[in-house]
Amino acid sequence: MQPTDSKTLTNVDATEQANETQTITIPPNKKKSKPSSKTRRRLKDAEPLPFTIDGLSHDGRGVAVYGNGFGETDGHITDKHGKKIFVSFALPGESALVKITNSRTSFEEGDAVRITANPNPERVVPPCPHFGVCGGCNLQHWQPDAQITFKQSVLAEMLVHQANVAPDHWLEPVVGDRLGYRTKARLGVRYVVKKETALVGFRERSSNFLAELNECHILDPRIGFEIENLKTLISTLDSRDKIAQLELAMGEHLPELPDGDQPVALIVRNLEPLSDGDIDKLKVFFAARNWQLYLQSKGADSIQRIALRDTDDLSEQFGRLYYQLPEYDLTFEFIPTDFTQVNLSVNRQMTKLACDLLDLKAGERVLDLFSGLGNFSLPLARLVGETGSVVGVEGSEAMTARAADNARRNGINNTEFYSQDLTHDCTDKPWANQGFDALLIDPPRSGAWEIMQYLPKFNAERIVYVSCNPATLARDTKALLEQGYRLTHAGVMDMFCHTGHVESIARFEKISA
């Protein structure tokens, strides 16, 4: 193929007909931390350069190196021998023409604008027409099973690098819905005067600009295929240029609930009060879809539910959403601003896996740290039975109260929930001195480093650690090994398919003296 300055990528789909291709539009780089204006002009005018992709970075970008003819054209001989370049949309073994988008002293970044030879057999046609522009996901060009295998390799590498350990057993990856799975998100909104239309969606890659979307294949289809209608709605509002964001939350429809069940909620963040006419338009749109409507003008305390019909009960600030864990006969109630796992199908499998790994027996006592709504606490309580107990500890008082409510609604009487700042040693609290057979940790991305400092005082025989960041899991694993635990199991979960995000789970067992 001849070199090209086109900003399109031809994806060769090895799993389809040999001649089938998919074109992905790649926008100009709009990164906030830009090189100098002179460097930007040089990068913009530069021809794409040929590279062979040697491997992948932890976020799924291809890695190539200047030298031996790579990064050179007939009219351009490079002096960057050995310098790495991270290439979006490229897979190992492929030869690609790469448009440089960012140049730094120690590395460069670029986009594969054409695969010229040796397309990776795991390359597929991205299902979403906006892939390459939208920053919502970055791996749709790669077969999903290959993505999750790669994510396990990322976890394995980090465990070796930071803790010098491998688990006794690798778990089978947990996979669920890979499209239409995301039930929580924040979508940016911007009205473009020149185009006389609103944009609704995620930001463009490496940019603060919103991508121009008509649909989203990652979002639950109840919202993902309503984006065009949301754009049209916002464009008709008097305050169309004052809507900043839509926060969405979705639950499951429960057939046993009355007709008032509204499993989709949107919070409209408006920068100034809306006119009565605008509110009426929103009410008509939301009522037709049986969605919950909220307005938010300032902070979280300003969120206001809007009645769509005369029978709506506004005695509380929020309506209710629900999800279920059928394995344990549990129904969870939550409000739109609560933290919940975004992939309900993976969450069902994840909770079962965590419970199985703890290998609980009737009568045992379990401590659940960062317990949230009780997503793990309530299944654990089912397993230990009435003679056992579960203590859930969570930083948010509101979430702690919601967990206790969920326990009562599900007829569970062997749980206790406490609100506590877990970054400080809390082992002097009465709840912490009950003695625990097993412990579950599900911390934020920052991990549980502070907890690692006082965790030995709980003296739990078994620990399951659920992580949304393999780097902090690996760091905390090292601490647990030093405290006399063995890493028996580890694995990854496909919570965020088509992104570089790695969700993982690990089991530790106390080594007998």
Swiss-Prot record:
Active-site residues, record numbering mapped to chain: C468 (nucleophile)
NCBIfam families (alphabetical): PRK13168.1, rumA
Amino acids binding [4Fe-4S] cluster: C128, C134, C137, C216
Protein's UniProt name: 23S rRNA (uracil(1939)-C(5))-methyltransferase RlmD
Keywords from the named record: 4Fe-4S, Iron, Iron-sulfur, Metal-binding, Methyltransferase, rRNA processing, S-adenosyl-L-methionine, Transferase
Residues in TRAM domain copies: 42-114
Biased composition (Polar residues): 1-22
UniProt family annotation: Belongs to the class I-like SAM-binding methyltransferase superfamily. RNA M5U methyltransferase family. RlmD subfamily.
Record: residues binding S-adenosyl-L-methionine: Q341, F370, N375, E394, D421, D442
